[in-house]
């Protein structure tokens, strides 16, 4: 009699559930980011956010590869992903913006409040993506926005303006880019994302003592990613095959 029958081990279920664990690990990375931000170690916080962004980028393709929805139909990967995204894309960046004193009181409370409330409402929008996989409205990527404000050492006026405009755009039917899933200009979009990430990593290595040329290039690449969705929306033939 065999003590262990390997044929009875639910390998498919174990493999699928491990993807959920990978996604959920983003919550611990966010916790480490909260600890760092509370101690004003913002460079460390953004490294943790960057790692969380990496996890967020790879868990979806892996989930589709191992057919997580089919194997584990009672576990919602989408719900789990939204929970982690809200913490890492919204809550932690809003906390960092407040902790940094970049805007100053009492407007820092107002800015953080606008970020977290508008983003919570956005996540409830069932029509946040278009047929071309653009996001409809600013897709609450506050981790990228707040990081950019840190890199450029934004003034209180600039930071508050960027926050206010982005919150306003959250509820407008203006397209924003999903750099991986949108097919139009995809090679260029991915190149700009790579440049943005490389320059962002360089800024962290420099502890935000970043040369002017790098700041300009970083902000320019960020503006491209921020605006290209709307440009492609108003010029539907641009980049179309």
Swiss-Prot record:
Q: What is the membrane topology listed in the Swiss-Prot or TrEMBL record?
A: Multi-pass membrane protein
User: Catalytic activity, per the record?
Assistant: a CDP-1,2-diacyl-sn-glycerol + choline = a 1,2-diacyl-sn-glycero-3-phosphocholine + CMP + H(+)
Which Enzyme Commission number(s) are on file for it? 2.7.8.24
Q: Which GO terms describe its cellular component?
A: plasma membrane
Instruction: Write out the topological domains of type Cytoplasmic.
Output: 1-15, 63-76, 122-133, 181-187, 236-241
- Its job: Condenses choline with CDP-diglyceride to produce phosphatidylcholine and CMP. Affects motility, biofilm formation and virulence of this bacterium when there is a complete loss of phosphatidylcholine formation due to absence of both the synthase (pcs) and the methylation (pmtA) pathways.
What is the protein name for this chain?
Phosphatidylcholine synthase
Q: Gene symbol?
A: pcs
């Amino acid at each position: 009699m065999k003590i262990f029958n390997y044929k009875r081990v639910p390998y498919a279920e174990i493999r699928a559930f491990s993807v959920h664990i990978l996604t959920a690990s983003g919550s611990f990375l966010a916790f480490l980011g909260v600890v760092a931000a509370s101690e004003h170690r913002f460079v460390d916080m953004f490294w943790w956010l960057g790692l969380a962004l990496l996890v967020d980028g790879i868990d979806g393709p892996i989930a589709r590869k191992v057919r997580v929805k089919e194997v584990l139909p009672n576990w919602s990967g989408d719900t789990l992903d939204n929970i982690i995204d809200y913490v890492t894309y919204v809550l932690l960046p809003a906390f960092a913006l407040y902790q940094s004193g970049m805007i100053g009181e009492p407007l820092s409370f107002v800015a953080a409040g606008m970020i977290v409330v508008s983003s919570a409402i956005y996540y409830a929008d069932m029509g946040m993506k278009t047929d071309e996989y653009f996001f409809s409205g600013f897709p609450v990527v506050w981790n990228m926005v707040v990081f950019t404000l840190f890199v450029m050492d934004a003034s209180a006026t600039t930071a508050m303006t960027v926050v206010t405009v982005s919150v306003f755009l959250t509820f407008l039917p203006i397209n924003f880019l999903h750099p991986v899933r949108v097919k139009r200009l995809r090679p260029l979009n991915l190149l700009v994302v790579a440049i943005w990430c490389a320059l962002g990593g360089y800024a962290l290595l420099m502890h935000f003592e970043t040369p002017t040329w790098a700041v300009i290039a970083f902000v320019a690449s960020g503006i491209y990613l921020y605006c290209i969705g709307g440009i492609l929306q108003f010029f539907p033939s641009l980049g179309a095959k």
